[in-house]
Amino acid sequence: MTGLPDGVDRALRVLAAVALERRQAYDALDAATGDGDFGSTFARGAAAVVRARPDDLRTAGLAFAAAAGGSSGALLGAALVRLDGRGLSDGSDAGAVAAALLDADAAVAELGGAALGDKTLRDALHPAAEALADGDVPAAITAARSAAEASAGLTARRGRSAYAGERSVGAVDPGAVAVADVLEAWVAGEPPTWEALLDRVGEAAADDAEDDRVDRAVDGLVAAHPTLRRLPGVRAVVRADSGAGPGGEPRVVLVSGGGAGHEPLHAGFVGAGMLDAACPGAVFTSPSSAQVLAAAEAVDQGAGVLFVVKGYTGDVLNFGLAAQSLTPASATVLVADDVATAVDDGPGRRGTGATVAVEKLAGALAAEGADLESCRAFGQAVADDARSYGIAFRGEEMEQGVGIHGEPGRPLEPRRHGSALAHALCEPLLAEVDPGAPLLVLLSGLGGTALLDLRRRTPTWPRCSPGRAARSSAAWSATW
């Protein structure tokens, strides 16, 4: 038992049991249009709650968010924190439970910005809470399940599934399904004990080596580079030296991060003239706000912290929460450069390749001793002027506009070669930038293209647009 009221203790055990049991099923649902990690994120947060066995919901929420990462970790953690102190007891008062669920729904809406109909867990949580307010538990469960099934007919407008646009229609939202599953389990019978749940956490950890793989990779990076160190107890890589300003004075420091699986981004760019700290999340999952906060506090020199954040919901949420909790002055550069996701009713463009340019150029300015606002303004100008576009190859077919986590792009088409491929890459980009501006061209294989192939394609840029090529300041090709 915990120090929580019996009903709340039971509800937490129900939540944890569902998350641990259905991890793979939720991942599979999420993979249909997203990056396939909702179940893993949900289970990771639940496992942290089981290990903590908290005496209040605030502690439960903070533990969940710190371990889970991603947008789901931040949102569900915030919902648990919001419920703390509501006076919930044995869970038999349907009206009190309904009010609590509506409050949790409001917390998710405020932090994540999702409206009803955006194809998120709110689409099941809100109608279930409203039905429960009338004291009708079966109606609440039916409302949640019906809403979860109906989410298949919605177009996603929040989270990574939103980048699939109309192709998200036909797939249910895993968060909405999870809400229905939890409510059904809530009335189905007694959930496992904390001891039994802890055994399940251990079994899951033995079966799933993902977190261990990321931690070992971080340790390997640090072991290979004595200029780096890992923060004790935190998955964060920082510079081993202080890296003070030109005259030894404090300077602005840069902190970034993102899901593992995109190496060398971001930890590979920790060093002089670039990042001072990087926070790797789980594979394809943004780091938690706790990671980001610890990294920022570790490297702060007193001149301010500049966060470089990619335009993904989880990154924006977790870096934003860290900035709110950070005592030193901070500022944020938001990178949103992917033209394939520039739609009016979506979550905004994804942040991709331009992140490397921002980290390098803003990092160089910080190393010269520029103040926080100058570094922010310059970094944001670089980000605002940048555009990127991705193409993936599948045998003799290719997919334009694909995301870095495998988010679907345009329908498959015959593979192009030579100048035809260069035009496919360049046309969406040239339409978005100032015709007379000098250009910095970055060609990245994202770890999936041999450097030999990247380098041989770099000269195709002049054939793509001769007039533009004359104004190219530089062309870089590598794996970023």
Whereabouts are the PLM-identified features?
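N-terminal loops that bind phosphate or other acidic moieties
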Residues: 1-480
